[in-house]
């Protein structure tokens, strides 16, 4: 039988370049891949086979979840040996069965968008993966027709390898149909068994017609199983036309009669994928788990492959660590036995513990695949609870139960959304989950490395505004004008700084709305009214999403104008019909802040954070809302909880992105409130020198260094505070702080401290007389620029009080 065309040797461009998607992902019907980064897809390769879908539907009125072997398609012998990378060049010799050697590879491959180094996988001879005694464990023997247990141990002895099902009378035979040396279809020389999957044995073979390359033959457990034949046909028809580097290649489909059987069995011929499965990696690491960043990076490689299937109207259906293979330079899905058309009915193959709970009701869906992504990610990193039957319990531990999730709170939120019991609350597409996984990975790396890992948001506009910058340093303005100021964050500043959600550039309404959203809010509202009138008059066709997108744009404009009532009216009307759109929650949260209901705003932002856990805008909003609650409520219900929440979220944002300076000042405020002044100074020192707020950060650091009780201030604190001010340009606040620093030094000496090495502060000798003279001259300099005449007199009086005694 002729071979199908194979995937190109060169890796395809990343499928998600320059694309983002918020809505539910549906099978694409265009002639190009959804991201248009690859060549045209043959029409026969992208349209689900209607005959096959009808066959699935004819099998059963409702889907029935069927058990798959836990070791399915894992290449089980990898538990004893690491296996070789698959593809090699035809020039070198690696022994019988393959005349190819590994291609030249980069010495280090990085995953996760280049952020995570791929672990080294040692290449070995593929023949080492062949099972010496291929046998299906009794606990994994089920009737191919009725799914009843068969071949089990009884009081008379071990279970039978072959026989008849007692429940339905169907024959079963768990012996491998092919033996070593057997030539299948005159082309594929069998080397032995690799593993047993849910649809039969998996064999290693050598393709004698194509450079003696290694291939895998996947056979059916029972040739009489029509349903299994249909599933195999699905692989051949759907997948042989596709070529994606993250999915095992289908080379051929052949039939072969062997083992004295009269009926020819079908075999799918696939590329041999060596390396280690993630299941094998877990076994080697036990009882430890795969590091968090590495586990996330693996799933980031898998999600584009899943999305590739989804774009063709297919669901993978059985994602788990066993089915993800890591070779020396790639991560690949290796088992296609459960692939089925989206929303098709019939037998559904999957693995308990990883399979979505609703799949028997809905059939294969994108949401079900993403559920298994979340479960797989959790299984790689966490020791998940196990049920009596040995399957993973369908729960995600809480941060209180799992320290790892306390360390990475964004990761916990991502796992919870991916595995939501309600599929409507999960990520709407593989791309949407990928975007959030990238953000969570950057948060994880920021925690682990202590370095920021910023990225451009896929969902929010840039955070351009700031709030709370002057909250601490602004208190020193009392020195120059005599006005008392409370260290409070301004609500209007917070709202102005929070970014607006972006409209999806691929949304049907984007082309119509994007030109209208430039300008001030009044212009935006006027443009929206004129556009709505043109649509009503039939001049312009109404995009299907215009009602939602237009209302959101109008709500944003009303919020910018401070018209909370009108904004909330629009949002309340949208909410019942678009309950899963987090942008409504975001706008409601901002409106609640403007309305002074900070607790309600916090709840809205918390919902948004759970839906887009990889974004930094929601934790920034949560931190601000918690701080606003603390400073505006006379008797907060739980001030410690609010303080901790504000600190945690400010820390998350600042640790991840040092461009969001509001988070640095917010974290410094919370640390200062805890009395951790030196830690607050350390945070402010991280504000980049290129930031327009660098000078204020340095001033605030100087203020905090001398704000502790006099007995706790050290000589180094005074020297550092003075050095900061010396390096800054002169402005009124620098002069104010000089007064404060010199005054602190005066009190430090008065308390009995003696300088060890410090000779001068801000040019004044570190003696009682020298510092008093310095304080006097600084106060007189302030008096010259004081805006209020009466306060100017007070400054002069104070200067006279501190000047050293003299005879003139």
What are the functions of these language-model segments?
Residues 191-198, 202:
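Protein kinase glycine-rich loop
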Residues 203-204, 211-222:
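Glycine-rich ATP phosphate-binding loop
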Residues 224-241:
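AlphaC helix of the eukaryotic protein kinase fold
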Residues 249-266:
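Short beta-strand micro-motifs within the conserved protein kinase catalytic domain, predominantly
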Residues 261-277:
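Conserved short submotifs of the Hanks-type protein kinase catalytic core
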Residues 298-299:
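Activation segment signature within eukaryotic-like protein kinase domains
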Residues 302-314:
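Protein kinase catalytic-loop region centered on the HRD/HxD motif
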Residues 447-554:
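Regulatory extensions appended to serine/threonine kinase catalytic cores
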């Amino acid at each position: 039988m002729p071979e199908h065309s194979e995937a190109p040797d060169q890796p395809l461009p990343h499928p998600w370049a320059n694309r983002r998607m918020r809505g539910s992902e549906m099978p694409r019907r265009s002639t190009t891949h959804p991201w248009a980064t690859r060549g045209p897809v043959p029409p026969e390769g992208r349209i689900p086979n209607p005959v096959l879908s009808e066959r699935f539907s004819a099998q059963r009125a409702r889907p029935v979840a069927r058990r798959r072997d836990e070791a399915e398609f894992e290449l089980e012998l990898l538990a004893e040996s690491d296996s070789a990378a698959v593809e090699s060049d035809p020039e070198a010799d690696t022994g019988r069965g393959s005349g190819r050697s590994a291609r030249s590879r980069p010495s280090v491959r990085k995953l996760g968008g280049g952020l995570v180094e791929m672990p080294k996988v040692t290449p070995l001879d593929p023949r080492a993966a062949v099972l010496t005694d291929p046998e299906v464990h009794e606990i994994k023997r089920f009737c191919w027709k009725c799914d009843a247990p068969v071949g089990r141990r009884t009081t008379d002895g071990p279970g039978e390898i072959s026989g008849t099902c007692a429940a339905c009378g169907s024959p079963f035979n768990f012996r491998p149909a092919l033996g070593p040396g057997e030539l299948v279809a005159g082309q594929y020389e069998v080397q032995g068994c690799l593993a047993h999957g849910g649809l039969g044995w998996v064999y290693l073979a050598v393709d004698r017609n194509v450079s003696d390359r290694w291939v895998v033959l996947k056979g059916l457990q029972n040739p009489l199983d029509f349903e299994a034949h249909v599933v195999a046909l699905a692989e051949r028809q759907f997948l042989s036309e596709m070529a994606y580097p993250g999915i095992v290649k289908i080379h051929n489909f052949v039939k072969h009669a062997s083992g004295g059987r009269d009926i020819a069995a079908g075999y799918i011929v696939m590329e041999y994928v060596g390396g280690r499965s993630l299941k094998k990696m877990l076994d080697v690491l036990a009882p430890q788990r795969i590091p968090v960043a590495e586990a996330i990076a693996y799933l980031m490689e898998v999600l584009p492959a899943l999305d590739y299937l989804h774009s063709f109207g297919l669901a993978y259906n059985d994602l788990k660590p066993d089915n993800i293979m890591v070779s020396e330079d790639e991560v690949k899905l290796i088992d296609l036995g459960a692939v089925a058309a989206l929303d098709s009915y019939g037998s559904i193959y999957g693995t308990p513990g990883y399979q979505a709970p609703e799949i028997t009701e809905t059939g294969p869906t994108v949401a079900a695949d993403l559920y298994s992504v979340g479960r797989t990610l959790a299984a790689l990193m966490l020791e998940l609870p196990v049920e009596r039957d040995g399957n993973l319990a369908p729960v995600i531990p809480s941060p209180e139960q799992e320290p790892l999730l306390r360390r990475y709170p964004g990761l916990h939120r991502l796992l919870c959304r991916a595995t939501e019991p309600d599929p409507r609350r999960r990520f709407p597409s593989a791309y949407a989950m990928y975007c959030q996984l990238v953000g969570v990975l950057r948060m994880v790396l920021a925690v682990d490395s202590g370095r920021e890992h910023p990225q451009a948001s896929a969902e929010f506009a840039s955070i351009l505004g700031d709030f709370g910058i002057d909250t601490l340093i602004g208190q020193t303005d009392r020195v120059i004008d005599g006005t008392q100021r409370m260290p409070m964050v301004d609500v209007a500043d917070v709202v102005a700084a929070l970014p607006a959600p972006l409209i999806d550039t691929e949304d049907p309404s984007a082309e119509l709305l994007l030109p209208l959203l430039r300008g001030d809010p009044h212009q935006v509202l006027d443009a929206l009214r004129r556009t709505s009138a043109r649509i009503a008059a039939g001049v312009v066709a109404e995009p299907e999403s215009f009602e939602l997108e237009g209302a959101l744009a109008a709500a944003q404009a009303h919020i910018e104008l401070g018209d909370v009532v009108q904004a909330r009216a629009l949002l309340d009307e949208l909410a019942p019909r678009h309950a899963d759109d987090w942008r409504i929650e975001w706008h409601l949260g901002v409106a609640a802040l403007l309305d002074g209901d900070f607790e309600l705003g916090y709840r809205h932002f918390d919902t948004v954070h759970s839906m887009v856990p990889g974004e930094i805008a929601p934790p920034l909003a949560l931190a601000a809302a918690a701080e606003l609650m603390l400073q505006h409520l006379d008797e907060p219900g739980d001030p410690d909880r609010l303080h901790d929440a504000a600190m945690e979220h400010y820390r998350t944002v600042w640790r991840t992105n040092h461009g969001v300076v509001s988070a640095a000042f917010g974290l410094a405020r919370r640390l200062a409130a805890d009395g951790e002044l030196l830690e607050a100074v350390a945070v402010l020192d991280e504000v980049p020198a290129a930031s327009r707020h660098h000078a204020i950060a340095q001033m605030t650091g100087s203020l905090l260094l001398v704000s502790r009780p006099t007995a706790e201030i050290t000589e180094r604190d005074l020297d550092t505070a003075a050095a900061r001010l010396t390096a800054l340009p002169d402005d009124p606040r620098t002069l104010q702080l000089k007064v404060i620093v010199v005054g602190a030094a005066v009190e430090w000496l008065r308390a009995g401290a003696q300088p060890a090495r410090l000779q001068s502060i801000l040019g004044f000798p570190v003696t009682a007389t020298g510092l008093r003279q310095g304080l006097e001259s600084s106060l007189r300099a302030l008096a010259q620029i004081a805006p209020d005449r009466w306060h100017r007199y007070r400054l002069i009086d104070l200067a006279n009080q501190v000047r050293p005694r003299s005879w003139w």
